[in-house]
Amino acid sequence: MGNHFTILIPSYNVEKWVERNVTSALNQQYDNYDIVYIDDCSPDNTFGPAKALLEEAHDQGFPGTIKVEKNSFNKGKMCNVYESIHAAKDNTIIVILDGDDWLAHENVLSYLNEIYESDDIWMTNGSYTIEPTGEVVRPMISDDYWTGTMRKKSWQFSHLGTFRKELFCKVKRKDFMNQQGQYWTTTSDQAIMWPIAEMSGPDHFRDISEVLYVYNRLNPISDDRVHRQDQLSTEQIIRNKKPYAKLERL
């Protein structure tokens, strides 16, 4: 049966890309996975097409569990991701697919399953293609990257980020929040990936050169376009947090 995966799709105002996004998740040639789709109170028509596609797949015998919901108010990606991961099945592997992006091909989960066949692998990050330029971006993580404080180094833990649920759950909730106790409104990737990478260390991490993800740069409301200052200030706060200690076991 293979490892169990949960594809988590946090979405907001992405109606132009719903079909491509959701279809890339549904078309995986793999049986043991769930899909969780969260529309964060989009004012556009994101939810309707997503709900229709996912409900149709369910009715046609999709092998896993499908959850699709629309928030009554905007919670932000960080809150949605945190709550959804904690509600996911135990022993699942989380695959975060942003609502305006898509998986690169139908064998992404099969590829990841081979990597996670080793219990020693707790997390991965990978390579992606930029839409529309076609540029391929790959992680550049040398042995030296793991020495010292990685939060002070260049950001390397980008798409596609995957990890075991149990690893994520070891990150303190307060580290996903500002001093007022509110979830970060931007920069959730760094808030997630740095702590779990610190706990994993190189022995429990795998960087992937295979392109598994398409990163869509056509979205005019992406955080780096409309919330750049908040993104930069939040990143600095996260960089300055105390690193997590490396774990010997999950």
Tell where the protein language model's regions lie, with residue ranges.
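Nucleotide-sugar donor-binding/catalytic module of glycosyltransferases
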Residues: 1-250
